[in-house]
Structure formats: C-alpha cells, structure tokens
C-alpha cells in the first residue's frame, strides 16, 4: 500500500512538473526595465522634442503607450517595493527609503520563478535581502555592470538557459545623481537641446544640470536599442514582452518625492509583438500596484492573495476601455520626515499633508543640486513663479485640490473654492476609505530629518528611524484593496 501511494505521489509530481514546463514553454519572455529618477515627460514619445530617445520612441511606436500610469510613491525603494509586491507602500512594511521588504510577502518575480521562469535582476537592488529568493541570478556589482548598470544586459540574454522563458528586472542607475562623467549615446547641448521644466528657473546652471540628466536618459535609451537588436538576433523578439517605466520623477525640485503629476506620473511603454498591436495609446487610469498581477496573468500564474493590485491585461487588446476611477499615492520619509497622502481621479487631484509646517524641496540630491541653488538665488531677488516657488514654500497647505483638466500643471489650489465643494468632499471621503481599509496610520514618531533642509548637512538624528506608517495596524498583513 505504501509503495502504491509513493508511486501515485511520484506520478502526480511528474505530471505537475510537466504541466509547469509546458505552460512555461508557451509563456512570453518578460523584460521589465525600470529607469531611475526619470519623469514621464522627459521621453520623446511623451512630447519632449528636445531629448534624444530614439529607441524608447520606437518601442512606443511598436507597442502600447500608457498616458496615465501612476506610481504609489515618488521615492526609489518604496516605489519599487510596491511594484514587486503589488501593494501600497504602507502595506509593504517598507514605506520609507532603504527599508527592506519583509520575508512573509510574495514578490511577483518569485512566483514567475516558481512557475518555471529563469529570473534575473541586473543593476540597482535595494529592496532588501529577502528579495534575493525571487531571482536565479543577481548582477548588482556596479563596477562589472558599468556606470549605468547596462553592460550586462546582452551578456545575460546570451547566457540565459535556452529551455525556459525568462524574466529580467533591469534596473539601470541612469538617471540618478551624481551624474556620470562620461555617457554613451547622444549628448545634449545645454543651450539648444534642453526643455526647462516650469518648476525650475532658466539659468546656465540649470540647463547644464538638465543636460547631464538628459545624457543619462539617452545612455539608457541606447542600451534599450542594443537589447532589442539582440532579441531580434536570437529570434525571440516576437514573444518577448518589454516594459519601460521609471520609479519616480526627475531628481530636481518640484518632481522627486512630490505627489503632483511631476512626481508620481510615470512613463509606461509595453511592447509585445505576439500580444499587442503596434502604435496604440491607452489613456486609462492605472496604478503601479497593478503591474504585478498583470504580468502574472500574462504568464499564466495566479497572483498571491497578498496582491492589492488588479490586472489590466485586458487593456493590451482593448486599450480604449476604462480601468480605474482612482489612484492613490503616499510620501513618507526620504531623507526628510514626511506624511502626505493623495488620491487622483482623471479630473481631480486631492493631497492631504499632515506636516504642512515643512517645505518640500525634494530629497537631498535634489535640494542641494545646481538647479535648486539657482531657484534659491532667484527667490532672493524676488523672481519666482508660483510653480517655481512651490519647492521652497513654507508652511505648505494642509490640503490641496486641483482641476487636472483646466490646470494640468497643478498650480492653483482650489480646496477652498465652493464651486468644487462636492468634488473635494468626494476625494476626501475616498482617501479616508482607502486609509481605513488598507490600514494606513500616521506614526506618532515619524522618522526625523537626516539632513538639514537648507544646508544639506547631516543632523544629530541621522540614521535614526521612527515608526513605519501602517505599523500600528500591522498593515503589512492587511490585503484589502481599497477603492478602485
């Protein structure tokens, strides 16, 4: 009897293994490219006619370009951790910069790996040691990978196992500060090849700062082109799904760590010749927590019960369909103490700031940049617009409300305008419902500033951590999705 049971169990395991191998053989390869500190409107395909991104522009032309993809945080590791888990930052247990993800959560590359994918990460990796289990291969040595982290992309593509589909998480350091002394790809003339964002002042220093930033994006762009050439050479381009996106807005005042569109709206391009018709645009509202369940569905893998996002795979075939009504985002500690929350619909944006007494000039790399110094110098002479002054404003509004259709740059706070009373109340209600359902809590002791907001010098509180948002309700164990 025991021998019969053993034979049955062996047969079941063989059949199960065979099914996984068969499913994996038919599944698409997936390449997820996540740029570092790149704004949505700093790509040619999104309307920037100064920056040189021919390969990303072609990727968009060959696939599907999303115009309303929103991150859950405009902060490096919290944003990436949110994508990896399909959860809001306060639900990951890693809502603050450089906080490691806990072991009890599932990471979507891990589920792909279990389904038979060869899983690899190249480049930036700071989501914590527990995520190591999600990858067969980690190539994170910056010296070996090159200054931007892209030198190993094609080497990995050539060396991968050829008998299974692959998932690559490609995380270049481009375009994170400090800028590389030399970059591959097209260069940008500060005088003629720059579109100065309205949040910055147009000075020689700002233009040079932006030129270095543009050069790093163009370097990344060049490697995207070389990667696609290698896919074609190997004859696997047709069934390889490529995504290009970014973790947060540009590392300049007014973008990175901000809850405006300049901070959390992100480029999102998907190319998959076998599954997506070329030359399409999707205007549906989507959250970055929706990426994990989408890629799992495409691969034929059931999402973990911990996932709060919803698959938008149907938009690959029908990009004209509506998806979300609301997207939510949060700003927690990133060099400086913070507790802000936002909810955005297609038409309106509402922001709640529990620490309005503080300014928000961005993290230290942004607020100590040449562009920030140019802003401060211009303010001293009394020459800033509303948008330019916003990064230096103190105190800030406790609430902000913008009409995205009439005011796309989000310059006029309408929270006190009676004409918008119903819309303000609706988004207030949605934000509270989201916080209640997902277990978001305001810490009694926020992680303090690690640097002086004006000088950038380390404070006495450097390296000290406070309470994580959501910790009081154990939000990392709450799986409710909140309003959709």
Question: Language model features by range: what are they?
Answer:
Residues 2-13, 20-400, 408-436, 440-446, ...:
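Formylglycine-dependent sulfatase
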Residues 447-451:
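A glycine-rich phosphate-binding loop feature that marks nucleotide/adenosyl-phosphate handling sites
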Residues 403:
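A contiguous binding-surface segment within folded domains or other stable secondary-structure elements
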């Amino acid at each position: 009897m025991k021998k019969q049971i053993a034979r049955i169990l062996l047969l079941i395991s063989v059949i199960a293994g065979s099914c996984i191998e068969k499913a994996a053989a038919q599944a698409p390869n997936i390449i997820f490219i996540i740029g570092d500190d790149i704004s949505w409107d700093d790509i040619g395909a999104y309307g920037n006619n100064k920056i040189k991104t021919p390969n990303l522009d072609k990727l968009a032309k060959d696939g599907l370009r999303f115009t309303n993809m929103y991150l859950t945080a405009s902060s490096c590791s919290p944003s990436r951790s949110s994508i990896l888990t399909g959860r809001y930052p306060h639900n990951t247990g890693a809502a603050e910069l450089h906080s490691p993800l806990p072991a009890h959560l599932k990471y979507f590359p891990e589920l792909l790996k279990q389904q038979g994918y060869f899983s690899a990460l190249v480049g930036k990796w700071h989501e914590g040691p527990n995520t190591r289990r999600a990858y067969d291969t980690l190539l994170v040595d910056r010296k070996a990978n090159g200054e931007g982290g892209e030198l190993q992309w094609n080497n990995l593509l050539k060396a991968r196992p050829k008998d299974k589909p692959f998932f690559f998480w490609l995380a270049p350091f481009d375009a994170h500060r400090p800028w590389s002394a030399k970059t591959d790809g097209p260069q940008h003339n500060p005088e003629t090849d720059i579109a100065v964002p309205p949040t910055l002042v147009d000075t020689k220093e700002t233009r040079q700062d932006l030129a270095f930033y543009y050069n790093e994006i163009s370097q990344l762009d060049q490697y995207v082109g070389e990667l696609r050439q290698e896919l074609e050479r190997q004859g696997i381009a047709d069934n390889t799904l490529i995504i290009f996106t970014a973790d947060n807005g540009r590392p300049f005042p007014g973008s990175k760590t901000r809850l405006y569109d300049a901070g959390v709206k992100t480029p999102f391009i998907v190319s998959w010749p076998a599954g997506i018709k070329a030359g399409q645009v999707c205007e549906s509202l989507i959250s970055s927590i929706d990426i994990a369940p989408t890629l799992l569905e495409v691969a034929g893998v059931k999402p973990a019960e911990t996932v709060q996002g919803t698959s938008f795979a149907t938009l690959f075939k029908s990009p004209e369909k509506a998806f979300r009504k609301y997207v939510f985002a949060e700003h927690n500690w990133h060099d400086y103490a913070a507790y802000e929350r936002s909810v955005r619909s297609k038409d309106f944006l509402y922001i709640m700031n529990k620490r309005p007494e503080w300014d928000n000039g961005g993290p230290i790399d942004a607020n100590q940049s040449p562009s920030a110094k140019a802003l401060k110098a211009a303010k001293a002479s009394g020459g800033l617009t509303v948008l330019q002054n916003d990064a230096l404003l103190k105190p800030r509004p406790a609430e902000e409300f913008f009409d995205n259709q009439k005011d796309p740059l989000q310059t006029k706070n309408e929270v006190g305008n009676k004409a918008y009373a119903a819309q303000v109340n609706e988004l207030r209600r949605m934000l509270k419902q989201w916080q209640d359902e997902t277990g978001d809590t305001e810490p009694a002791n926020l992680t303090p500033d690690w640097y002086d907001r004006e000088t950038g010098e380390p404070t006495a509180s450097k390296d000290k951590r406070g309470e994580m948002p959501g910790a009081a309700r154990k939000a990392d164990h709450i799986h409710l999705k909140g309003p959709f």
